[in-house]
């Protein structure tokens, strides 16, 4: 059985088991405000409401070692299938590189498929989730990893006051680089401040530690503004402070959520 088939089988088995544990009618949380993975590096620790379909989109510009890259649409589709379970689909991103003699080319990246299972709230008031995923090698020849690359993320969050939240994520991935995999650990932490009811700002540190190659240390900050209860605009920027890190990155995004189905 291929890794992709194993992954799909795991999703189906987990979904069937979780269905029996459904605690509320699907659609009961449809009116809750939107909560996105954007624009932080760390993913959100909560799932989208059951029956809701959420699209998160963006455009970024990154400069690294003299090479500037634009990428879009950064689309992530998240479908709530149970009260604490969502399916996740990462649409291939198009990378546009400035012309250089370094051999960089333009094209689409790989597609990703995964799910999020919310475990919290747990002891201590933490919200915690686990996000297994795998990328599928459908991208351009010079951009795709040409492998089925698994990853697991564990995002967490905890409200400190009515307006301050601490959050972060631990993850491990195994991307294909050339003939081998390069197992990479990652950790991030950020602090979010609710400025007004629809407006949040944050600052975040993220570190990636590959098995081969130097560590990537980054600091980013940004804000998100809910133009409607289930629509959001975001803006972010950051910089690296290690040899392997990007010099800087900036980006904008737009996300929306709507109710796709209901059942009891």
Regions found by a protein language model. Give the residues of each.
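N-terminal secretory signal peptides that target proteins for export/translocation
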Residues: 1-3
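Bacterial N-terminal signal peptides
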Residues: 5-16
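Bacterial Sec-dependent signal peptides at the C-terminal "C-region" and cleavage site
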Residues: 14-25
